[in-house]
Amino acid sequence: MRTLITLLLLTTSVLAQSPAELAISSARNVIAKKPAQFSGYNQLAVALARRARETSDVNFYAQAEDVLKKSFELAPANIEGEKVKIWLLLGRHEFAAALAEATALNRQVPDDVLVYGFLTDANVELGNYDAAEKSAQWMLNLRPGNLPALTRAAYLRELFGDNEGALELMNMAYQATPSSEAEDGAWILSQLGHLYFASGQLDKAADALQTALIKFPGYHYALGNLAKVRIQEKRHAEAVVLLQQRYKAAPHAENLYDLAEALELAGHHEEAQRAFTEFETKSLAESVRADNSNRELIFYYADHAHEPAKALTVAEKEFARRHEVFTLDAYAWALHVNGRDAEARKQIATALAVGIRDPQMMRHAERLQRSEVDRMQASSSPGSDKTVVGMETRY
């Protein structure tokens, strides 16, 4: 009970004003004083985009885009505005468009660290890992030890299977983050928690995530990752509390899916079913957007609703858009539940060849390998068609 009370205190406290909200107020003051200067509108657009990350509310991206239009009216094609535009495209998961814009801007400003960061992000999300690694290396070459490069390099290390290297780089990033930047610090701590969790260091993961929640109370990224730790520890009731808090803070379909799974694990089957039903409705409504929950929808149809054809339809749509490892995994699983294991093994092998050691992906790969062994054993058993053919050709 004491643990649950402490958990509630950590997750329900709120900051009087978040860093992004303070930045929004500051930018609006700048605009009020100098409405004819484009820089104030760029500043406000950035602050609104930061608020989108704080809250996971995509409406802030739309507000930022509207503000950015004013910047371009005052100063067409200003470089800072172009960078904000790409950041917004990434935030809305329009990765191909972001890559095209970042590539064009890189030709104009070939030594800009942040533009290389955008190239890294877009290439990672599209599955272009060699190009992403080159861009991240350029960031470090241009300005060794810079914070944006460290976090991106850490993520690439994780994707390539080097969790120790990822932890080292992310810890360096945390040390380089000013203590006044509460959300940035909480975000990095949330990533550290994820990396410790992936490495099996549950105590360190929990410590990092609880520190993130002290730094930024109710932070949705920290809540989600701490819930994973609690599930691994079989503390399902606490995981449900955490995921309820996250869904309240960031009411998106993918967060509802995680909550539904936790409710199922906690034995709340009727409540879980209601959550899954609501998830499907919300997920389908947003599936036409680039920023969607299609991966969760694939796994819902494959593992919970047991509608393999629907899983494959969604997976094929997502696979047509991007080929990064998590989409390959979801596509492979959709192929598997539709009985297309040979194709599924090819997709999961492509994902694992990058180096990633994601636990769910590894479980899927093992399951596909077992299904191949079972198939081979069945085909070579006495009386099978293949055995008969073999006997006929040998004698």
Can you name each region flagged by the protein language model?
Residues 16-80, 91, 100, 370-395:
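N-terminal leader/linker segments that initiate helical-solenoid repeat arrays
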Residues 35, 76, 110, 144, ...:
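Short coil turns that delineate tetratricopeptide repeat
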Residues 46, 53, 87, 121, ...:
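Residue-level recognition of tetratricopeptide repeat
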Residues 51, 55-58, 92, 126, ...:
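Structural motif corresponding to the intra-repeat A-B loop/turn of tetratricopeptide repeats
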